[in-house]
């Protein structure tokens, strides 16, 4: 179906109610009307009650428990596959077409509203699929009411924020639309948005309201407020207006980039912009071509820093040495310079440690030394290898049952956390860390789950005998007080004593573990994956103290939701010392939009991050992020400063000089070139005199690298013995490994990632793990999101 066949629909409620979770469709495409299906993700993991479009890939890589509509390259529905039908498993995607796939009521309602031979168009810019039994009309006008202005976004509210330049301050669970001073929507999605100058933000939290905004409030639409009513419209005249608006926003981005002294090719950007003519836009297809070009230009404004950690979390699924080499080679090609390898998953260790009590051995470890193969493969590719180990999380719990912490109801929680107060467990986990540190030439160790489970206001943790005895010994408060805390929680007068006790206990365990590791391996960096929520009683995880005390070198906050990177990066950045570093955790597994992924990559650099870590490798590849990033923002290699210290410092000197030159070029002032032969302190002094923080950023990082350097410790004889299970020459060649060996195919693998940096595992395998029955899928995803978003 061609775009030229669009006919005018007029004013029509575009079946937003149809997409409300657990609602019922009251309009069908065969009625001749155009219905709109809001799309949550492109090529993402199909979580519960969401709609995903799969395109430009061979298959969906999902299980059979979704409701599927298959659309040909001509824009015609050619097949419908209900949830549970085996044909929907890893469904083929038509070349040039797409698959519309959903779960839960949202998916079922979409499926029932569509018929074979209906016309369908995916408007990716607006993140919606338009479907009709006749000609498709992309235009509309509708109105809805809001409940308040500049107020807290509670449940059952739809809020307008209109204080220019101020953030909305919302959490990561809603959906926001930004409107500029001309009344055009300039962005849709995310949270904690900055209110545009002279414009406003529409913010929703309820599922029905979020779907309302997704269906109607697409970028480029006109948005007008009258009283407590918002009217949104989109017509032919807005096609070219959309492009003009995007160009204006791009110009603002350019000015921002220059003010932040980003080292990008401004001349090349100007040349590409000059070739764009809004008058070339006359329908959705031509609009999308121009918009894609503008987005491509916008991404040129993201600086490719020469020194930056580009990390990825991954729990290995490979079954052979050859497959390991192939995986690491793929990471290198994607621009990854650091791998955080999870070596424990669901209570199983890929390393067979002698007399290991707290973990079972992964069955693959009897066939080859998985970790040693990763050590060798990463060394060959020049990738920094950080081993990530869950400290108190037990996974399936079989091996750590004697050490469990208990809830205030006396129960073992589903995540099987060990008690931080249990000395026997801590001795065992310390021995495990020590064995890894002294038997493998790793570059770093990362603490995962070094905390209590999340306190949700009702279920608290730490009521095992070891914890209660220690609390009484340290505070003098007896069993009656502990029983009272268990019942009253935050309302109890000694609640803060309880929280401080648990927090202090975690602090001590971090210090003890780091002291032991550093006594064995002074040459490696120690980091921690930490929760984004830092409320005192949420996790009892005081990472700012760990950094201040020097007990960890760096932290990786898991700030996975859309729209929260700026504030999260600034918050955790305030914890930094002159000898620590910050790598921001990105939720690739959450099926974030590609625009959001680029935005977060840029924001972590702008707001004080030293790099980014994607959770996790399988999702990063399957969702198309790797293929996109390696074409632009990660097309050039970067140095990890915790791996190549001296080289990083020299590169930062050069970057500082280039930024100094750009500063004078943009300000119109004249000045001397920066002498890169000066000491770092002298360079910093010269640059700081200009009062511009962007001028000093490179040397500030160089000074931190110099202060926390482990370089003088490198080359020491710290290993007890090298593993005898060296990779074969065939493994080293690596290139001929099969797809199945590399863990890249869709299988019914039972391997999954149990790490605090994310429990989603490899996204190729995850859909089958979640699958089984739809209800089980919803529960599983609920557990994952409940744990990760908090």
Predicted region positions:
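Substrate-binding cleft of secreted/luminal carbohydrate-active enzymes
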Residues: 551-569, 580-719
């Amino acid at each position: 179906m061609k775009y030229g066949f669009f006919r005018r629909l007029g004013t029509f409620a575009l079946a937003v109610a149809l997409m409300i979770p657990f609602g019922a469709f009251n309009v069908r495409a065969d009625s001749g009307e155009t219905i709109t299906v809001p799309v949550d993700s492109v090529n993402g993991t199909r979580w519960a009650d969401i709609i995903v479009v799969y395109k430009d890939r061979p298959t969906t890589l999902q299980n059979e428990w979704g409701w599927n509509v298959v659309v040909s390259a001509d824009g015609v529905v050619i097949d419908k596959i209900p949830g549970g039908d085996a044909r929907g498993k890893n469904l083929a995607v038509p070349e040039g077409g797409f698959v519309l796939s959903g779960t839960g009521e949202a998916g079922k309602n979409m499926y029932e509203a569509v018929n074979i031979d209906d016309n369908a168009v995916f408007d990716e810019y607006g993140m919606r699929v338009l479907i009709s039994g006749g000609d498709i009309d992309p235009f509309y006008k509708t109105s809805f009411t809001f409940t308040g202005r500049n107020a807290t976004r509670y449940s059952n509210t739809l809020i307008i924020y209109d204080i220019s330049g101020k953030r909305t301050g919302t959490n990561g669970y809603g959906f926001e639309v930004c409107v500029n001073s001309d009344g055009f929507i300039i962005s849709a999605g995310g949270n904690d948005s900055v209110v545009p100058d002279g414009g406003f933000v529409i913010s929703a939290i309820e599922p029905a309201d979020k779907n309302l905004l997704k269906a109607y409030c697409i970028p480029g639409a006109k948005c007008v407020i009258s009283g407590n009513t918002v009217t949104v419209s989109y017509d032919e005249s807005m096609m070219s207006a959309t492009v003009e608006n995007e160009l204006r926003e791009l110009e603002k981005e350019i000015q921002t980039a220059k003010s932040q002294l980003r080292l990008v090719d401004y001349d090349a950007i100007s040349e590409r912009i000059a070739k764009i003519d809004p008058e070339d836009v006359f329908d959705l297809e031509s609009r999308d071509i121009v918009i894609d070009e503008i987005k491509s230009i916008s991404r040129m404004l993201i600086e490719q820093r020469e020194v930056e950690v580009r990390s990825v979390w991954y729990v290995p699924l490979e079954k052979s040495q050859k497959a390991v080499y192939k995986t690491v080679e793929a990471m290198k090609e994607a621009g990854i310079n650091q791998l955080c390898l999870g070596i424990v998953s669901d209570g199983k260790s890929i390393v067979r440690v002698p007399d290991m009590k707290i973990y079972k051995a992964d069955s693959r470890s009897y066939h080859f030394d998985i970790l040693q193969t990763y050590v060798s493969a990463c060394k060959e590719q020049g990738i920094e290898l950080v081993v990530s180990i869950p400290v108190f999380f037990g996974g399936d719990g079989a091996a750590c049952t004697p050490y469990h912490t208990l809830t205030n109801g006396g129960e073992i929680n589903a995540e099987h956390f060990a008690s931080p107060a249990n000395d026997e467990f801590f001795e065992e986990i310390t021995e495990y860390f020590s064995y890894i540190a002294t038997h493998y030439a790793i570059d770093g160790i990362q603490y995962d789950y070094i905390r209590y489970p999340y306190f949700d206001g009702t279920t608290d943790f730490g009521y095992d005998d070891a914890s209660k005895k220690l609390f009484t010994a340290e505070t003098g408060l007896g069993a009656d007080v502990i029983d009272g805390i268990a019942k009253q929680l935050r309302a109890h007068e000694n609640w803060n004593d309880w929280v401080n006790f648990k927090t202090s206990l975690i602090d001590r365990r971090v210090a003890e573990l780091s002291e032991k590791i550093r006594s064995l391996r002074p040459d490696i960096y120690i980091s921690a994956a930490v929760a984004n929520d830092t409320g005192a009683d949420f996790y009892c995880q005081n990472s700012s103290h760990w950094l201040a005390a020097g007990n960890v070198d760096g932290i990786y906050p898991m700030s996975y939701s859309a729209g929260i990177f700026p504030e999260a990066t600034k918050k955790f950045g305030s914890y930094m010392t002159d000898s620590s570093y910050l790598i921001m955790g990105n939720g690739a597994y959450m099926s974030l939009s590609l625009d959001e992924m680029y935005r977060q990559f840029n924001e972590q650099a702008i707001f004080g991050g030293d790099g980014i870590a994607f959770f996790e490798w399988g999702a990063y590849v399957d969702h198309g992020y790797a293929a996109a990033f390696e074409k632009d923002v990660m097309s050039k290699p970067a140095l990890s400063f915790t791996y190549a210290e001296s080289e990083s410092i020299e590169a930062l000197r050069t970057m500082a000089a280039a930024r100094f030159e750009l500063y004078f070029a943009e300000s119109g002032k004249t000045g001397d070139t920066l002498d890169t032969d000066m000491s770092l302190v002298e360079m910093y002094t010269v640059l700081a005199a200009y009062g511009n923080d962007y001028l000093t950023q490179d040397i500030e990082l160089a000074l931190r690298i110099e202060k926390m350097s482990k370089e003088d410790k490198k080359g020491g004889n710290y290993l007890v013995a090298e593993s005898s299970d060296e990779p074969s020459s065939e493994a080293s060649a690596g290139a001929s490994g099969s797809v199945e060996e590399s863990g890249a195919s869709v299988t019914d693998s039972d391997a999954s990632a149990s790490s605090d940096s994310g429990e989603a595992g490899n996204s190729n395998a995850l859909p089958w793990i979640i699958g089984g029955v739809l209800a089980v899928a919803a529960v599983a995803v609920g557990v994952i999101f409940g744990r990760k978003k908090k």
